[in-house]
Curated annotation (Swiss-Prot):
Signal peptide: none annotated. Keywords: ATP-binding, Cytoplasm, Kinase, Nucleotide-binding, Transferase. Disulfide bonds: none annotated. Its main location: cytoplasm. GO terms for molecular function: ATP binding; guanylate kinase activity. Belongs to the guanylate kinase family. CDD domains: GMPK. Essential for recycling GMP and indirectly, cGMP. ATP binds at residues 12-19. Residues 5-183 form the Guanylate kinase-like domain. This is Guanylate kinase. It comes from Albidiferax ferrireducens (strain ATCC BAA-621 / DSM 15236 / T118).
Amino acid sequence: MDYPGNLFVVAAPSGAGKSSLVKALLELDSHVQLSVSHTTRAPRGQEKHGREYFFVSEQEFDAMVKADAFVEWASVHQHRYGTSKRAIEERMAQGADVVLEIDYQGALQIKKLFANAISIFILPPSWDELRARLERRGEDSADVIELRLKNAAIEVAQVHKFDFVIINELFDRALFDLKAIVHSQRLKFSAQRRARAETFKALHIF
């Protein structure tokens, strides 16, 4: 189905800066809305239920899987994450641009179900910098950091399957690139014809 809103799918290895970039984008562009996923992991830091994620139990997650409530779900770092199809479609139907923060497995599943979804992969500038960021975050033990780096190698190997790639070396530059991708989709013919219908009509463009 052709919705007036766009769907942006943003994936990255842990520590690449995906969440920080998406948060900054949301603060700058009120037309972009975050699709909040469900997860079985515990909240981190200042995270709140319903804002960053819907935090649910394993049993609740199982029930949603059985009810076919997710457009995709995957296991990441020993926890499960799922995306509600209904929530995405309702927001896009209202004309909002929806952004999904998701792992690469989920991103590729979303692309199969939403053919027009725009996929974006965030890369770190180097492996050393990725390790340093994970260590500076101070949230994980040394063993967990090693697991995240191991998983990151698997995730980065999928980068060629994405539409756009942003290297997050300088945050402001990476944010500029992310904003440019979002804006470019709004300038496509179909989007402009819908958003500027009166102008197109006056110019006899149908």
